Amino acid sequence: MTILASISSIGNVKSISKSNNVSLSNSSSSLQSMNSIQCGGCGNGGLLGAVGGLVGGVLTGTGVIVGSVLHGVGSILTGGSNNCGCN
């Protein structure tokens, strides 16, 4: 019976990974939002850059939140100083 339980759990893991792939389909929009966040974060403090990253992620879609949060954490650590000079 443990073999059947392990097989059913493997099936559940596969379905979870499929749902994650759907949320990652907005990768191009996440790159665009991260670029705009980097441009807006220049000259602001690290905390302000993090808040802007979170708000931008919520507004553009759920798939973007992960990238925006990661960028926000980077802004807190670096103070957003390396994001100056947007192209």
UniProtKB/Swiss-Prot annotation:
The organism's superkingdom is given as Eukaryota
Q: Which residues form a coiled coil?
A: none
Read off the InterPro entries from this record. Answer: HssA/B-related
Similarity remark: Belongs to the hssA/B family.
The record, for PANTHER family, names:
HSSA/B-LIKE PROTEIN 17-RELATED (PTHR31857), HSSA_B-LIKE PROTEIN 17-RELATED (PTHR31857:SF2)
Recorded protein name is HssA/B-like protein 18
Which organism is this protein's natural source? Answer: Dictyostelium discoideum
